[in-house]
Amino acid sequence: MEFSRETRRLALQKMQERDLDLLIIGGGITGAGVALQAAASGLDTGLIEMQDFAQGTSSRSTKLVHGGLRYLKQFDVEVVSDTVSERAVVQQIAPHIPKPDPMLLPVYDEPGSTFSMFRLKVAMDLYDLLAGVSNTPAANKVLTKEEVLKREPDLKQEGLLGGGVYLDFRNNDARLVIENIKRANRDGALIASHVKAEDFLLDDDGKIIGVKARDLLSDQEIIIKAKLVINTTGPWSDEIRQFSHKGQPIHQMRPTKGVHLVVDRQKLPVSQPVYVDTGLNDGRMVFVLPREEKTYFGTTDTDYTGDLEHPQVTQEDVDYLLGVVNNRFPNANVTIDDIESSWAGLRPLLSGNSASDYNGGNSGKVSDDSFDHLVDTVKAYINHEDSREAVEKAIKQVETSTSEKELDPSAVSRGSSFDRDENGLFTLAGGKITDYRKMAEGALTGIIQILKEEFGKSFKLINSKTYPVSGGEINPANVDLEIEAYAQLGTLSGLSMDDARYLANLYGSNAPKVFALTRQLTAAEGLSLAETLSLHYAMDYEMALKPTDYFLRRTNHLLFMRDSLDALIDPVINEMAKHFEWSDQERVAQEDDLRRVIADNDLSALKGHQEG
């Protein structure tokens, strides 16, 4: 079904003519999951996103459907049980996206090690039990030092005790979002990107009856009426709630920044994903992951209070990650000049404050560490050894971390909360990508109940555990064979086997629709046939409106195919300009925007500063 710029125009028109059952603010994975289940359950559903879908946070993850093995060190069995159960569901409903990728976890004899060999074995066995893969080919393996080095010979040998291998899954985070969005659109949801909520419409009793929004492409104000409104904006959740709490700061969220860096595989060759302690005795672990012909590694985890739309990779972030990687892979000698791409994302962590947190628990008690840290900071301020800002930050940490075991952001729960304010606004916040379906299911259970009680409308929630996303109509037990069959179909449309296989993996059961475009398209100037098909499918069926949408989120060219990117920039912009009938001024603006994003991802400013 078409999902294009024209679809967007019609959706905005219809949203202004109706009284929706549910308006969703936010088009990341949380909002996309809610939209899919709401539309499939028959709710008259609308969704607005102020940027591109997944642009804010959901395209900036570690790109794993991660089981969370490290939580078992903290005995958070419920967290891991929920996570691996939901991971299995995502495999069922989006079988073309998560791919099994066994993870290697080396163990070192050093201060601050997350696991000893014994604890790792216990954790992996429990993990397998929770994931239902005990006594299967996917079950964990304990490795000797020699076996670890046979798999990854460039790992640091000093202090290496051995390791383990356990089942994990790589993910294409932005594709998971757009496939949920497309399915919601097919089921009748009205969806538009680049539309920003600016205020609420309120009735005489102060209850929300809609939203005042702005079309950021036309700068027109839009009035959207809805019986219920849900806020799924991740790190922006507090800002949206602020609309109806003028002058009263809301601190439900505690965003933390995570940075990943990308280098060529030859510079940092790893044959499989590696999850390893930093070696800095800071209680953290990092991933080193092969993708395409590149290797990426991360993440950092630091509190963030800056611009939510444009989190930046700093020199401190780079120094930290390069220090970790060069310590663990001593022969790599990775420098900032080797970094081909990068990304910085914000985790929408909950600050605590008695939120309903199925991933962590919430005692509501200030931890000793938090309290002691505040006392020490106040003493330092009195002695003129610290600043007022440091005291304010320490107070905020106590206010917003009542259930934390320690101050380290890595220890803050990734749990979710579902709340309703006095004005009727629902907010679904927190959580991890893996949990998105369960979060949406819980929220919609409550929303459907409210629609019946307050508006007399009855709906039956679909079984979202078996409801596939767009592209996901593939037998989960037979993914590789079905993808290969689609690829064979692509060769009949004139594609090479490699190109057909790439498109089949990217689009799943939508691949035949992509191949069918060959009936009306030939290779555009400067593009291969496969690139032309992918671009036009993104514009007409995935609401890609800007070159950055295509290069960064509909595909991963900007992250993991940097070698070929420069040659594609002009041909892609030319084709989009022709398709969308851009003026010369608009074409220049789009190119400037793309080159700014590329410069940010390439860390051009940091590299230039070093050279200067």
Swiss-Prot record:
InterPro entries: DAO_C, DAO_C_sf, FAD-dep_OxRdtase, FAD/NAD-bd_sf, G3P_DH_FAD-dep. It holds the Pfam family DAO_C. One of its GO terms (biological process) is glycerol-3-phosphate catabolic process. It is found in: Cytoplasm. Keywords: Cytoplasm, FAD, Flavoprotein, Glycerol metabolism, Oxidoreductase. Its EC number is 1.1.3.21. Residues 398-418 are annotated as: Disordered. Its main location: cytoplasm. Gene3D superfamilies: Alpha-glycerophosphate oxidase, cap domain, D-Amino Acid Oxidase, subunit A, domain 2, FAD/NAD(P)-binding domain. It catalyses: sn-glycerol 3-phosphate + O2 = dihydroxyacetone phosphate + H2O2. Residues 398-408 have a biased composition (Basic and acidic residues). GO terms for cellular component: cytoplasm. GO terms for molecular function: glycerol-3-phosphate dehydrogenase (quinone) activity; glycerol-3-phosphate oxidase activity. FAD binds at residues 21-49. Its cofactor is FAD. PROSITE patterns: FAD_G3PDH_1. Belongs to the FAD-dependent glycerol-3-phosphate dehydrogenase family. PANTHER family: ANAEROBIC GLYCEROL-3-PHOSPHATE DEHYDROGENASE SUBUNIT A, GLYCEROL-3-PHOSPHATE DEHYDROGENASE. This is Alpha-glycerophosphate oxidase. It comes from Streptococcus pyogenes serotype M3 (strain ATCC BAA-595 / MGAS315). The lineage of its organism: Bacteria, Bacillati, Bacillota, Bacilli, Lactobacillales.
